[in-house]
């Protein structure tokens, strides 16, 4: 009986922790503007005609990316200088594979003065899970 109770508690805690790991849609006001964590649906709708930045490696980008995206690798030593070539007053839409690199890149973009930063919740994985197309 104790083993069953421990197993049930372990499963419940595991599910609870996993549910908390994924970023939820949110809005964070920063010194320079705002960082929005948005759903794939909102990202798809609102990024049309805007700057879309894929912060994955060039190899990951070559294997498939959101149409119209430019690749600025977060791990590139020139990441920030490449970002600064973009218009900081225009919205930017940033994504990676799962959302972790995007969070870092979004904070860096905001710190550099980007006023409207949009972070794809769940990254490209969630984009694909929603049956949205990627291109090579």
Kindly give the residue locations of the regions a language model identified.
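Rhodanese-like catalytic fold shared by cysteine-dependent sulfurtransferases
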Residues: 2-8, 18-41, 46-50, 58-90, ...
């Amino acid at each position: 009986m104790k083993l069953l109770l421990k197993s049930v508690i372990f499963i419940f805690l595991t599910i609870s922790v996993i549910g908390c790991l994924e970023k939820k849609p949110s809005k964070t006001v920063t010194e320079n503007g705002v960082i929005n964590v948005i759903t794939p649906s909102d990202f798809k709708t609102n990024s049309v005609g805007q700057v879309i930045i894929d912060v994955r490696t060039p190899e990951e980008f070559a294997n498939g990316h959101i149409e119209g995206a430019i690749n600025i690798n977060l791990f590139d030593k020139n990441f920030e200088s490449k970002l600064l070539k973009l218009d900081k007053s225009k919205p930017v839409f940033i994504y990676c594979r799962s959302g972790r690199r995007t969070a870092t890149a979004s904070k860096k973009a905001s710190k550099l003065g980007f006023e409207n930063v949009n972070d794809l919740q769940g990254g490209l994985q969630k984009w694909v899970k929603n049956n949205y197309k990627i291109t090579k």
